[in-house]
Regions:
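Transmembrane and membrane-interface helices of multi-pass
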Residues: 2-234
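Alpha-helix initiation and N-capping motif
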Residues: 21, 124, 217-220, 239-243, ...
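Glycine-centered secondary-structure boundary/capping sites
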Residues: 59, 81, 110, 129, ...
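Short amphipathic alpha-helical patches
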Residues: 73-81, 110, 114-124, 128-132, ...
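Short alpha-helical "patches" and their helix-cap loops
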Residues: 82-83, 234-245, 341-345, 558-560
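The feature marks either
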Residues: 205-212, 216-267, 274, 306, ...
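Solvent-exposed soluble domains appended to multi-pass membrane proteins
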Residues: 251-637
Length: 637
């Protein structure tokens, strides 16, 4: 068999394996998320799978076929052929991991991967540890399969590779490369007509409903499109119209510069002298459903809420830690078309939480029980101008724990207490738990096992019980200190627990399914216990603590202090899947901005409600302000 025939035969077999793998991944997505796709008809499902091949071929053409082109470069070398096939199989296994990761991601968030691949580096140590510990057998199997594949590939090349005469070999190689090039162009465009634009996500949306398009797409295609269009988004409103609709300066605030529509300072404070310590306790994956249904799993927190200002209409700003952290620390929601704080958004000017305490000579202390590299939390804390930062590597472990990829809240809370207790000044403290982060299949401390480890919920509840005990120990220590009486604690979760294929009460509204939360403002010597109906999100935390300590520094936000009586009654939640939820005392509305043509049609026909239009305006105004450096003035902060 000639060299070219060997390459052609092996290439066809390779591409067949790749196409089958893409199909199996789509089938896995459909079966794993069957409840989500169950509303599709049989015809819609069939057409989705059929159209899915177009988007699979496009992904293969962009990321895999270029290596096949290199294979047919007229190099008459057995070693060269082995190197290219090694790269081809490596690309296949990497693609397989991305596709499989996308299925898991979709089962949690009901959206495909987009720019999330950029955050892989921030979770690399966690992913690696999880792969080598909790899923070592899967990791081992993948590596074993990879090397077995290489073994048989090399063996076949050694057996069938023969050298060819140069003139014919070169000519045939060039013809094959030209044919592959034409196929690549056709696949990238999704048709044989080479005019017009390449295949895009909108093409999938035009083929049917939102769920149809989601079944058509794959994680590689959606990620490539998301990264390509990271700073390019469709804006539905005129820029100035969006800014005018989005302005929300209340009478207690003062606008500073009309060119900076969200830049203001607080001129009238809600109450008190401002001479308070502030402590934020950011709870990994805690949520209201577990608090209400399993109070025995968090007895210390239940006791705290009885003596707190308890905001029962508090909502998370996102489904992921990075979104919630950005909202909490910088008062910026999820903004489509802009990168995450750790991938470029940090280059924009914005309000930095700890800076508002420097003018008052506060100590600023941030403790995270997770690794500093997780979501680059160390960099985020430093960017927020916290003077002291401590993470898992800085926390002495005093209990005997099993091997766990995250950190231990008991020792973390103790370190946090020691650091704020040693402060000679007032302080801002930020504590970020992580012991309730998955995987949950191991008991951290036997004495804090409340339930048998037989179900996923029980495993998580045992973690809650441990983390709650750690927080209870912290407050027992804090109550004995003189600074406790003038300290305001703000306690709230980052997001819901991300169980794959989690089922919710069908009677719940989507915003309540995915974002409902709680906020306890605990200061028994300052506030009388009360349940408060105010609607608020994590975006409100920064304006609120600025209000509490009477900071006169300018800040930028599209929201207001939670205590501001003139603030809007409704809140806006911008989900990572481009859905917007508007929630208030007498309002609940949604709008899906991923369906661009539908939104344009609603605008053209003037069918958007006032709140839907305002929701679009707010996000677009924030986008324009951040992108054009009109969000915050650097010189002041």
């Amino acid at each position: 068999m000639s060299n070219l025939k060997t390459k052609l035969k092996m290439s066809c077999l390779y591409l067949f394996v790749v196409i089958v793998a893409f199909f199996i991944i789509r089938l896995s997505l459909f079966l794993l998320c069957f409840d989500y796709f169950s509303t599709l008809s049989n015809n819609e499902i069939f057409l989705s799978f059929l159209n899915g091949f177009r988007f699979d071929f496009s992904s293969i053409a962009i990321f895999i076929l270029p290596l096949v082109v290199f294979l047919f470069i007229p190099v008459n070398s057995k070693a060269y052929t082995k190197i290219i096939f090694t790269l081809m199989w490596l690309m296949f296994f990497v693609s397989l991991l991305i596709l499989a990761g996308d299925v898991v991601f979709f089962s949690i968030f009901n959206k495909h991967l987009e720019t999330e691949l950029l955050s892989v580096q921030t979770h690399f140590s966690f992913i690696l540890q999880t792969a080598l510990q909790s899923y070592w057998y899967v990791t081992f199997s993948i590596f074993l399969l990879f090397f077995i594949t290489l073994y048989f590939t090399y063996r076949y090349i050694n057996k069938n590779f023969v050298f060819q005469s140069q003139p014919k070999f070169i000519l045939k190689s060039i013809l094959i490369i030209l044919c592959i090039g034409l196929i690549m162009l056709a696949c990238i465009r999704g048709k044989w007509d080479f005019r017009g634009k390449p295949l895009g996500i909108m093409d999938a949306q035009l083929l049917g409903s939102q769920k149809t398009s989601e079944l058509i797409l794959n994680g590689i295609f959606s990620s490539a499109e998301g990264l390509r269009r990271m700073e390019d988004r469709t804006c539905f409103l005129d820029k100035q119209e969006a800014i005018n609709l989005a302005r929300n300066i209340t009478p207690s605030e003062q606008e500073i510069d009309s060119d900076y529509p969200f830049y203001r300072y607080k001129k009238d404070f809600s109450f008190g002298t401002g001479d308070y310590n502030i402590v934020i306790i950011f709870l990994e994956s805690w949520e209201r459903e577990y608090y209400e249904q399993y109070p025995e799993a968090m007895p210390n927190f239940v006791e705290i809420t009885k003596n707190s200002l308890y905001f029962k209409n508090f909502y998370n700003s996102g489904s992921r830690s990075l979104t919630s952290t950005t909202s909490t620390m910088f008062s910026i929601p999820y903004v489509w078309g802009l990168p995450f704080i750790t991938n470029g958004l940090g280059a924009k000017n914005m309000s930095r939480m700890a800076s508002y305490f420097k003018e008052k000579d506060y100590s600023t202390i941030f403790v995270a029980t997770d690794n500093a590299s997780a979501d680059k939390i160390g960099e985020v804390a430093n960017y927020s101008q916290f003077e002291q930062f401590y993470a898992k590597a800085n926390i002495p472990v005093t209990h005997k724990y099993p091997t766990y990829t995250k950190g231990f809240d008991w020792e973390g809370f103790e370190l946090f207490f020691n650091k704020i207790n040693s402060s000679k000044n007032n302080f801002l403290g930020f504590f970020y738990t992580s012991s309730t982060h998955g995987p949950w299949d191991m008991i951290l401390l036997k004495e804090y096992q409340l339930y048998p480890q037989t179900t996923r919920d029980n495993q998580f509840l045992n973690r809650l019980y441990y983390s709650d005990a750690a927080m209870g120990n912290f407050f027992n220590l804090a109550k004995q200190q003189p600074w406790f009486d003038k300290t305001i604690f703000l306690i709230f979760p980052d997001h819901h627990v991300p169980f794959p294929n989690r089922t919710y009460d069908s009677n719940l509204r989507d915003a309540d399914k995915y974002f409902t939360s709680f906020l306890a403002i605990y200061a028994p010597k300052i506030f009388k216990p009360q349940q408060i109906d105010t609607y608020a999100t994590q975006e409100d935390i920064l304006p609120t603590i600025i209000d509490l300590v009477h900071s006169s520094q300018p800040y930028s936000s599209d929201t207001n202090s939670i205590f501001d009586k003139e603030r809007s009654k409704e809140i806006y939640i911008y989900a990572e899947n481009k859905k917007v939820y508007i929630v208030g005392p007498d309002i609940y509305e949604e709008i899906d901005l991923s369906n661009i043509n539908k939104v344009k049609e609603l605008i053209a026909e003037d069918k958007l409600s006032y709140y839907q239009k305002k929701a679009i305006a707010r996000n677009e105004a924030i986008y324009h302000s951040l992108k054009n450096h009109k969000w915050h003035k650097k010189s002041n902060n």
